Amino acid sequence: MTENYKHTSVLLDEAVNGLNIRPDGIYIDGTFGRGGHSRLILSQLGAEGRLLAIDRDPQAIAVAKTIDDPRFSFVHGPFSALADYVSERDLTGKIDGILLDLGVSSPQLDDAERGFSFMRDGPLDMRMDPTRGQSAAEWLLTAEEADIAWVIKTFGEERFGKRIARGIVERNRIEPMTRTKELAEVVTAATPVKDKFKHPATRTFQAVRIWVNSELEEIELALKSSLGVLAPGGRLSIISFHSLEDRIVKRFMREQSRGPQVPAGLPMTEDQLRKLGGRYLRVLGKMMPGEEEVAENPRARSSVLRIAERTNA
């Protein structure tokens, strides 16, 4: 990282308020980033409170080291493994709240060397953790055209996915792409109809980033783990930034709040119904950023905060 980035967390107060912080509670900030949410949580905890922060971005490690607080601990890794981190600390079923701020952060987008943005030329990387897995350039060079098209259509909701995939494969045959600018140029050239409100490469960059980082799978794993990690009354406070993320969160909260779906007229005793499982979550609602926050931070426009509470089931 070549410079110090100031990062304003979207829906900062609302997301932390959604945790309903208890002074002696135990909380998880699953997406530490630059520490905005963690610092606010710590400010509301008493001497007996604890906060475990998680992030797979190596740049978050240096930021975490600046928080000299005995109540605070940090794990470098994916939030999908939160159940393991909690189990190692003998805290399973004792967590009072989990906060997740999904997707790519502004500092990651603004750092050209990370390769997340088509607005800044840099290495075609896009990995949240550059020490693990394939970079975007490596995947695009080795993947089949049909697979690239599927990823762009599925995770970018891009209607010209096949044309763009063909352009990527043809470009890589001539000379392998290594820069974000090169990918943006290929996508732009392969897009026959341009959206005047959106750069042609927006959806493709989103799709490749999601695929390279297994972002949606990470979310699903973390959500499933949360049920066993949270104490009764523990909160889930989750910020999504695009419809694919929000769809997963919304569906999970809805399904876990409905309880077992039994066909009408099926004769079952109360004991049999209990064995099927109960309503594990109570949905508390959703929030969107206000006009003032969007004006100050345009990237907040598409964000959605959803909050749910673990039941006694």
Swiss-Prot record:
<feature type="binding site">
    <location>
        <position position="55"/>
    </location>
    <ligand>
        <name>S-adenosyl-L-methionine</name>
    </ligand>
</feature>
<feature type="binding site">
    <location>
        <position position="101"/>
    </location>
    <ligand>
        <name>S-adenosyl-L-methionine</name>
    </ligand>
</feature>
<dbReference type="GO" id="GO:0071424">
    <property type="term" value="F:rRNA (cytosine-N4-)-methyltransferase activity"/>
</dbReference>
<feature type="binding site">
    <location>
        <begin position="35"/>
        <end position="37"/>
    </location>
    <ligand>
        <name>S-adenosyl-L-methionine</name>
    </ligand>
</feature>
<keyword id="KW-0949">S-adenosyl-L-methionine</keyword>
<dbReference type="GO" id="GO:0070475">
    <property type="term" value="P:rRNA base methylation"/>
</dbReference>
<comment type="similarity">
    <text>Belongs to the methyltransferase superfamily. RsmH family.</text>
</comment>
<dbReference type="InterPro" id="IPR029063">
    <property type="entry name" value="SAM-dependent_MTases_sf"/>
</dbReference>
<feature type="binding site">
    <location>
        <position position="79"/>
    </location>
    <ligand>
        <name>S-adenosyl-L-methionine</name>
    </ligand>
</feature>
<keyword id="KW-0963">Cytoplasm</keyword>
<keyword id="KW-0698">rRNA processing</keyword>
<dbReference type="InterPro" id="IPR002903">
    <property type="entry name" value="RsmH"/>
</dbReference>
<feature type="binding site">
    <location>
        <position position="108"/>
    </location>
    <ligand>
        <name>S-adenosyl-L-methionine</name>
    </ligand>
</feature>
<dbReference type="Pfam" id="PF01795">
    <property type="entry name" value="Methyltransf_5"/>
</dbReference>
<keyword id="KW-0808">Transferase</keyword>
<dbReference type="GO" id="GO:0005737">
    <property type="term" value="C:cytoplasm"/>
</dbReference>
<protein>
    <recommendedName>
        <fullName>Ribosomal RNA small subunit methyltransferase H</fullName>
        <ecNumber>2.1.1.199</ecNumber>
    </recommendedName>
</protein>
<keyword id="KW-0489">Methyltransferase</keyword>
<dbReference type="InterPro" id="IPR023397">
    <property type="entry name" value="SAM-dep_MeTrfase_MraW_recog"/>
</dbReference>
<comment type="function">
    <text>Specifically methylates the N4 position of cytidine in position 1402 (C1402) of 16S rRNA.</text>
</comment>
